[in-house]
């Protein structure tokens, strides 16, 4: 039998996550992706170009949603992410500016978990 979390542990995990989650409704012109090492980080800015939060890591689900939103084929997006993150950042940032929209950025504990 596979063991998992107890009811108490699950409740604690849910409570912890509810305290650490944040959702932001942002214009894509207020977003910027920046490569750092093998990761991409999302920077968020307010209307005065001041950072809203610390740079955020982007999880795999959010990467897929960003690529889908920008109409970048998944295989090409993944190749840029692994082989040439600077090119991916340039592409994403350019499309964010060129075709601005309001998007919800869902975060949990310093990581973008959804781009809706």
Regions found by a protein language model. Give the residues of each.
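Feature for intrinsically disordered/low-complexity regulatory segments and propeptides
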Residues: 1-115
């Amino acid at each position: 039998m596979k063991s998992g979390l107890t009811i108490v542990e699950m409740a604690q995990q849910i409570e912890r996550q509810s305290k650490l989650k944040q959702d932001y409704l942002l214009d894509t012109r207020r977003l910027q992706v920046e490569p750092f090492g093998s990761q991409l980080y999302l920077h968020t800015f307010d209307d005065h170009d001041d950072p809203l939060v610390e740079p955020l890591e982007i999880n795999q689900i959010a990467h897929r949603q960003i690529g889908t939103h920008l109409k970048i084929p998944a295989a090409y997006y993944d190749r840029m992410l692994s082989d040439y993150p600077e090119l991916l950042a340039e592409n994403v940032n350019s499309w964010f500016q060129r075709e601005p929209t309001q998007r919800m950025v869902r975060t949990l504990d310093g990581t973008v978990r959804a781009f809706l």
